[in-house]
């Protein structure tokens, strides 16, 4: 029925993509399910959003048993692959529904208020909340994607979906579908396989989290494969260091870009265009490599203090936004919705600032600020110089309880293979 929560629980798989589009066409609300999360946490979320249908990959049959037992709202469970033990497969489900009349959702306005997806938040401060993303929100995201991610060159598009489609990569597929682009689906990320696909399948667009982007940069094939088909490598979901941007331009050419958004304002609150990255890497406004780009045309952004006042240009505050990209709120969580929508704005929970040219800079998550000895320390400001050290692959800085200072700063560092660095060396390099 219209508005039913329809969960798709699968690794990257062509049938999973088909199920997402089919659910939307039938009027359901797509619920992406993280295959890396525990069965119990997935069951908790699916029960919360009152899931009616669950489409799953056979490799997850054991976890499905846990979910079914804990989700009383379920009406049907369908396996999207070959599984002799499944009560129903995608083939039998389609045969059974062959003559079912699909409602015509088309109207002159595209039913903008209908819920497209109940997207889980990151759950960093508790159980995930279900973000009610409407058709109107997605149309806005697609329009922004067509403008900033695809542009005028719409012929012969080949998009490689290699990041999990249970996250932003799943929503991006729809942008390419609107212009008849081809999407290749890789079940998981392998840097060598991605580079091979770019060369042999003439991939034009790819979306990657920073860790995968770094793996591509460091792979020996990155400098030997023919990657000339690439038009954009969109890196998002976490900050990218300026040095990694510069290396990306050297290795891949002027195709690397970055965007900023969140489930509550999907994907494109701001966009750091490839030409801006390339220019900044060459020395024209190099500070822009620290930004997440200019605010997009359909979105209004303000930097607010805790009382809802706009702070002066260049000063730090909470990044807040409004416009047709911002979602309706959280499923069955009116208090959480009200808390995020104060002073007439959606509050992202991110601390940042705007410059005079409308470039947006993110400093840190508001809740990730470390207070040590009465001083406010943003984790990203400690992470940045560590990430700039040769041999450092990844870094995360956290605050840990400290009897003297309240909190002390701890850095968790992952080194490139074969690199040896002692903690004292890192501290000596980054300490003021």
Set out the residue ranges of the language-model regions.
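Gly/Ser/Thr-rich phosphate-binding loop
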Residues: 178, 203-208, 217-287, 300, ...
């Amino acid at each position: 029925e219209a508005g039913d929560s329809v969960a798709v629980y699968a690794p990257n798989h062509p049938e999973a993509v088909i199920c997402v589009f089919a659910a939307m066409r039938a009027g359901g609300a797509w619920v992406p399910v993280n295959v890396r999360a525990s069965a119990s946490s997935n069951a908790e979320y699916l029960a919360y959003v009152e899931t009616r249908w669950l489409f799953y990959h056979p490799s997850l049959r054991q976890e499905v048993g846990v979910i079914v037992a804990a989700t009383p709202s379920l009406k049907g469970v369908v396996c999207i692959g070959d599984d002799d033990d499944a009560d129903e497969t995608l083939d039998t489900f389609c045969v059974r529904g062959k003559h079912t009349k699909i409602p015509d959702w088309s109207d002159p306005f595209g039913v903008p208020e209908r819920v497209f997806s109940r997207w889980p938040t990151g759950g960093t401060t508790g159980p995930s909340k279900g973000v009610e993303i409407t058709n109107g929100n997605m149309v806005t995201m697609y329009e922004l994607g067509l403008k900033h991610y695809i542009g005028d060159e719409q012929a012969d598009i080949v998009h490689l979906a290699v990041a999990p489609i249970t996250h932003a990569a799943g929503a991006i597929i729809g942008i390419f579908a609107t212009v008849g682009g081809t999407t290749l689906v890789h079940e998981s990320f392998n840097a060598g396989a991605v580079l091979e696909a770019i060369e042999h399948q003439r991939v034009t667009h790819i979306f990657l989290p920073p860790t995968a982007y770094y793996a591509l940069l460091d792979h020996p094939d990155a400098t030997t494969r023919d990657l000339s088909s690439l038009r954009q490598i969109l890196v998002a979901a976490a900050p990218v260091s300026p040095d990694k941007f510069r290396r990306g331009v050297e290795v891949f050419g002027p195709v690397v870009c970055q965007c900023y958004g969140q489930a509550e304002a999907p994907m494109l609150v701001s966009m750091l265009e490839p030409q801006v990255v390339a220019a900044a890497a060459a020395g024209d406004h190099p500070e822009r490599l620290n930004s997440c780009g200019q605010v997009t045309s359909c979105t209004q952004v303000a930097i607010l203090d805790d009382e809802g006042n706009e702070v002066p240009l260049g000063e730090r505050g909470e990044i807040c936004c409004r416009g047709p990209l911002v979602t309706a709120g959280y499923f069955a969580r009116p208090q959480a919705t009200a808390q995020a929508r104060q002073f007439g704005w959606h509050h992202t929970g991110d601390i940042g600032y705007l410059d005079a040219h409308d470039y947006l800079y993110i400093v840190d998550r508001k809740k990730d600020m470390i207070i040590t000895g009465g001083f406010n320390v943003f984790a990203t400001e400690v992470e940045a110089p560590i990430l700039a050290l040769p041999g450092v692959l990844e870094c995360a800085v956290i605050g840990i309880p400290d009897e003297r200072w309240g909190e002390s700063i701890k850095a968790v560092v992952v080194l490139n293979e074969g690199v040896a660095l002692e903690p004292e060396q890192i501290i000596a390099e980054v300490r003021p």
